[in-house]
């Protein structure tokens, strides 16, 4: 049986893609009052705006209301996946080759359960990571969680694009 998160993913993924968004993550939290948290990114690599979140939220809300997956009242939160976005699909590692990532493992690899390094390659269900001047090969199914890391270079790039968008 599918989890509620997987059922929601199956319902909204294609529609969000048609709207130009990648569905990054679906989480359902809370016991007495449910919160459905949806993280999105834009397929064109532009920044997710408040308008994007509103548009996606309205669409998702309509779909969830029609399908009636969640019987009790819930809050819907749609937001950007952020600069330190989670990597939840193998394809994410391919997309972010050259970027720094923090990876937590399900079990030890070379005596470690965490790695932070640069993604060199992602192929054959393996992630190749440059870590402390070494190459580490991590089987995808060994990864518990992973997030991009905000580096100084990325921060400067973000500041540069903010300054450009704020000038008229």
Curated annotation (Swiss-Prot):
Keyword terms, alphabetized: Cytoplasm, Ribosome biogenesis
Entry-linked Gene3D superfamilies: Ribosome maturation factor RimP, C-terminal domain, RimP-like superfamily, N-terminal
GO annotations of cellular component type: cytosol
BP terms from Gene Ontology: ribosomal small subunit assembly; translation
Regions crossing the membrane: none
Pfam families per record: DUF150_C, RimP_N
Domain of life: Bacteria
CDD domains per UniProt: YlxS_C
Subcellular localization(s) per the UniProt record: Cytoplasm
Family: Belongs to the RimP family.
Biological function: Required for maturation of 30S ribosomal subunits.
PANTHER family xrefs: RIBOSOME MATURATION FACTOR RIMP
Protein name listed in UniProt: Ribosome maturation factor RimP
Encoding gene, per UniProt annotation: rimP
């Amino acid at each position: 049986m599918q989890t509620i998160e997987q059922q929601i993913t199956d319902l909204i993924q294609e529609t969000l893609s048609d709207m130009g968004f990648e569905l990054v993550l679906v989480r359902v939290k809370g016991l007495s009052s449910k919160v459905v948290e949806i993280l999105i990114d834009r397929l064109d690599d532009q920044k997710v705006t408040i308008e994007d979140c509103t548009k996606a939220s309205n669409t998702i809300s309509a779909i969830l209301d029609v399908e009636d997956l969640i019987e009790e009242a819930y809050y819907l939160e749609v937001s950007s996946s952020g600069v330190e976005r989670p990597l939840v699909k193998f394809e994410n590692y391919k997309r972010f080759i050259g970027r720094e990532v923090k990876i937590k493992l399900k079990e030890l690899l070379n005596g470690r359960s965490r790695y932070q390094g640069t993604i060199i390659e992602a192929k054959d269900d393996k992630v190749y990571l440059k870590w402390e001047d070494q190459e580490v090969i991590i089987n995808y199914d060994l990864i518990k969680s992973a997030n991009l890391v905000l580096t100084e270079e990325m921060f400067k790039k973000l500041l540069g694009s903010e300054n450009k968008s704020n000038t008229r």
